A protein has these predicted regions:
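Acyl-donor (CoA/ACP) binding surface of acyl/acetyltransferases
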Residues: 4-9, 13, 46-155
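Conserved GNAT-fold acetyl-CoA-binding loop/helix
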Residues: 10-32, 43-45
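A short hydrophobic/aromatic micro-motif that marks alpha-helical segments and, especially, helix-coil
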Residues: 22-24, 37, 138
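Short beta-turn/strand-loop junction motif enriched in small, turn-promoting residues
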Residues: 34-35, 135
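Short loop/turn motifs at secondary-structure junctions and domain boundaries
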Residues: 35-41
Length: 155
């Protein structure tokens, strides 16, 4: 994680965490992911290259009642090839096999056009503008406007 994307300032530009400065930052994140998985509160997966063991990124969902909130990060080297769109589609399909999940949502900074396009290609619909919604510390200490996206399970 550290070498693949954790320390990359461009990858971390729109996320809500600062780039990692040492391996122990990754150990803390992995520990938190494992605790959340055990508690059933969130599920995170690391994404690896098809033909090898190179880490490409990560994707996760956080459970909130009848819905899941989606988040993802991808190593810059793999931007623009559709890998994350594929991962999002797989995770959403998995989520909708859970009887209690009716909605998968995502929030994206209004300037993050790559994520906007990704979510729309994956079938998410923009629901609206969330004013001063999230602090992206690599951009500003002031909360920034974000778009809310969702995909609803067909009932």
């Amino acid at each position: 994680m550290f070498a693949a994307y954790g320390q990359d300032h461009e990858v971390a530009h729109y996320v809500t965490w600062r780039p990692h400065t040492c391996i122990s930052d990754n150990e803390v994140v992995i520990g938190r992911f494992l605790d959340l998985w055990r508690d059933g509160c969130a599920f995170h997966w690391l994404l690896f290259q098809y033909s090898g063991s190179e880490l490409m990124g990560a994707i996760g969902v956080r459970r909130e009642a009848h819905r899941l909130e989606l988040g993802y990060v991808l190593t810059r080297r793999y931007w623009g090839y559709g890998f994350m769109t594929e991962a999002v589609t797989v995770v959403v399909d998995w989520a909708f096999t859970e009887p209690s999940v009716f909605r998968v949502g995502a929030v994206v900074d209004i300037d993050n056009q790559r994520s906007v396009r990704l979510l729309e290609r994956a079938g998410f619909e923009r629901e609206g503008l969330l004013r001063s919604w999230a602090v992206h510390p690599n951009i500003s200490a002031t909360p920034r406007d974000c778009y809310s996206y969702s995909k609803i399970r067909n009932i």
